[in-house]
């Protein structure tokens, strides 16, 4: 069965989006993009900063087009390991705590391990916390609970 362009694009997007690529860890995503374009027959190379440059060709050198996209995702960096074992984060990029609440996260350790957890309000029990709905979401009031 022949795939349509939309199916192909969706499949490629799912594959690329499945690659963890927080700021500073974009090499694997960049390599995926590089190989994807090479498999389509395009010349692709990496830049000094780790970006991917692809020449799509064309006959008029004075009528070019540049398309740029980020391969990194917004995220957080561990600012503190609390006495409870939970993690206080600080933002990387423009990540806002209210946008990440209740999201699953992966923490990359210095030794290369990946530990999963959940980013949530420090007092996340709606049964006990009467101020849950009104609580300000910030990196001081939210934390990562490790699995």
Language model: regions and residue ranges:
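N-terminal hydrophobic/helix-forming segments and targeting peptides
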Residues: 1-147
């Amino acid at each position: 069965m022949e795939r349509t362009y939309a199916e192909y694009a969706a499949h490629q997007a799912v594959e690329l989006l499945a690659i963890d690529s927080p700021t500073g860890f974009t090499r694997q995503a960049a390599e995926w993009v590089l190989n994807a374009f090479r498999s389509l027959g395009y010349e692709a190379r990496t830049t000094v900063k780790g970006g991917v440059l692809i020449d799509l060709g064309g006959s008029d050198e004075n009528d070019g087009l540049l398309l740029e996209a980020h391969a990194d995702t917004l995220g957080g960096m561990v600012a503190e390991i609390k006495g409870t074992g939970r993690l206080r984060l600080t933002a990387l990029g423009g990540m806002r705590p209210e946008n990440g609440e209740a999201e699953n996260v992966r923490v990359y350790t210095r030794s290369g391990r990946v530990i999963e957890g959940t980013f949530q309000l420090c007092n996340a029990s709606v049964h006990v916390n009467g101020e849950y709905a009104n609580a300000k979401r910030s990196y001081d009031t939210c934390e990562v609970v490790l699995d």
